[in-house]
Amino acid sequence: MLQKNKLSLSVQYPDKRLQDIITRPKLRSWVKAALLAPAQITLRFVDAAEGKDLNRNYRGKDYATNVLTFAYTEDEDSETTQADIILCTDVLQLEAAEQEKSVEEHAAHLVVHGVLHAQGYDHESDEEAEEMEALEIEILADLGFRNPYINL
């Protein structure tokens, strides 16, 4: 079980379509479940246009993606995770339908995924991917969600 830590969380819904489904209390519980250290995190739900702009400007990829994580470290000795995590509502809803999951279930996975990225986890190599996916599966199970990698 991961250690629960102090959290300062800001949630922004410029794309308001999911704010009644993916509520602030749910988001707080999902973020806290994935935290290994104290954190200051902003979650922002955007439409496809903003998601595409951010992905193009920061990753050089000209399409909207499901989640983008921007991790910030003010100093290397800081124990506080600081990040902006951007979730694209359009992509989230499309992927949930394609994967036959509820929007809530898929959003929980993407939030956990983004929080792990903010803490330095990645999936560039097979070993990194295995470690990150194992953590995601454990965290989501603790939250009452099924393994997100089954039937993909």
Curated annotation (Swiss-Prot):
Recorded hits in NCBIfam families, A to Z, give: rRNA maturation RNase YbeY
Q: What does this protein do?
A: Single strand-specific metallo-endoribonuclease involved in late-stage 70S ribosome quality control and in maturation of the 3' terminus of the 16S rRNA.
Q: Which GO terms describe its molecular function?
A: metalloendopeptidase activity; RNA endonuclease activity; zinc ion binding
What Enzyme Commission number(s) appear in the record? Answer: 3.1.-.-
UniProt: Zn(2+) binding residues:
113, 117, 123
Location comes to: Cytoplasm
Q: Determine if Nucleotidyltransferase is one of this entry's keywords.
A: no
Where the protein is mainly located, per its record? cytoplasm
Please give the family membership noted in the entry.
Belongs to the endoribonuclease YbeY family.
Descriptive protein name: Endoribonuclease YbeY
Reported cofactor(s)? Zn(2+)
Question: Per the record, GO CC terms?
Answer: cytoplasm
Question: Cofactor note, please?
Answer: Binds 1 zinc ion.
